[in-house]
């Protein structure tokens, strides 16, 4: 977990008021332990010299000078550069830093001590935090590190190289456009032409195939068959029957009419269904033949889109880099 410390009012959180008894200050170990607690283990006291300013009973006020250091390298955020976080190293682990402070003590060697540091001032920044992944994550740039200028120039050079690649990428896009036009033309031509020589679409080809079923159903219309049967078969049969006998028995003739009409309907339905299945299979076969042509168009388009996205990413990265570097220079973070 990253820790943040800021010297200021937080230093007043611990007990104030402290002391000096028998002319003795708190021991160095007590001072170091209290300092470590007060600064959450981030800072540690290395050396200290006390000067008594006031003493009353078991309480005393002291001025302090000496050396402190950090338990880890500490950093503070100073800006953003594209996808990189710019940090300044404010403290170096175990490197002594001069400090001055005030402290109060309360107690005696026999009773023990309570100590509070305040008015802390160090010859280093009063800000900093531990960055756990500083050595494993490349997203950080340390502005006061020895390799900052090198890393900055390397990143800038890589962006310039990408930007210079845009003309070649745009040339690839134009070549793909030509390929896609040719591929689309082949895919469209696959459906053939109609009787008037006009290029058909997929919908046109679908209608043309299934037109055979529509024509079959039209030619074998059951209602038309019934009308024709009544006129050409049933009525003449009834007339002939009555001509042979005034007491013509019409039932067999009517039954045959009903059977023939129903049978025609049944056969028409069965043949229409059979034809529909055949035409559907024909359509599936036709579509399978066209599928590779459509996929070719799609593959070319996917390549084109990928290149266009790459160009867009390069432009955005360069624009962001330019904007961020200008802002960082205005703020004095980089030169």
UniProtKB/Swiss-Prot annotation:
Q: Which domain of life is it from?
A: Bacteria
A Pfam family cross-referenced in the UniProt record is DUF1202
Which InterPro entries does this chain map to?
Answer: DUF1202
Tell me the protein's name: Uncharacterized protein YggM
Organism in which the protein naturally occurs:
Escherichia coli (strain K12)
Annotated gene: yggM
């Amino acid at each position: 977990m990253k820790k943040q410390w800021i010297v200021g009012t937080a230093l007043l959180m611990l007990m104030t008021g402290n002391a000096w008894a028998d002319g003795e200050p708190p021991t160095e170990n007590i001072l170091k332990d209290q300092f470590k607690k007060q600064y959450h283990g981030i800072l540690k006291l290395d050396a200290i010299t006390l000067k008594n300013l006031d003493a009353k009973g078991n309480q005393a006020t002291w001025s302090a000078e000496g050396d402190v250091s950090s338990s880890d390298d500490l950093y503070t955020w100073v800006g953003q550069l594209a996808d990189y976080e710019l940090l300044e190293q404010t403290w170096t682990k175990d490197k002594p830093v001069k400090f001055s402070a005030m402290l109060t003590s309360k107690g005696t060697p026999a009773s023990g001590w309570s100590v509070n540091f305040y008015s802390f001032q160090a010859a280093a920044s009063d800000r900093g935090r531990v960055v756990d992944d500083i050595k494993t994550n490349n997203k950080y740039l340390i502005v006061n590190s020895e390799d900052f200028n090198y890393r900055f120039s390397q990143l800038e050079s890589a962006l310039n190289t990408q930007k210079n690649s845009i003309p070649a990428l745009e040339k690839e896009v134009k070549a793909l456009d030509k390929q896609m036009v040719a591929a689309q033309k082949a895919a469209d031509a696959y459906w053939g032409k109609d009787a008037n020589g006009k290029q058909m679409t997929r919908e046109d080809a679908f209608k043309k195939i299934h037109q055979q079923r529509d024509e079959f159903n039209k030619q074998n219309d059951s209602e038309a068959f019934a009308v024709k049967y009544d006129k050409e078969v049933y009525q003449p049969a009834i007339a002939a029957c009555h001509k042979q006998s005034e007491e013509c028995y019409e039932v067999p003739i009517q039954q045959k009419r009903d059977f023939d009409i129903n049978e025609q309907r049944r056969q028409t339905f069965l043949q229409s269904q059979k034809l529909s299945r055949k035409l559907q299979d024909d359509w599936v076969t036709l579509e399978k033949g066209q599928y590779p042509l459509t996929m070719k168009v799609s593959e070319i388009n996917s390549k084109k889109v990928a290149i266009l996205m790459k160009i867009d990413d390069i432009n955005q990265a360069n624009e962001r880099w330019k904007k961020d570097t200008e802002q960082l220079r205005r703020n004095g973070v980089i030169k």
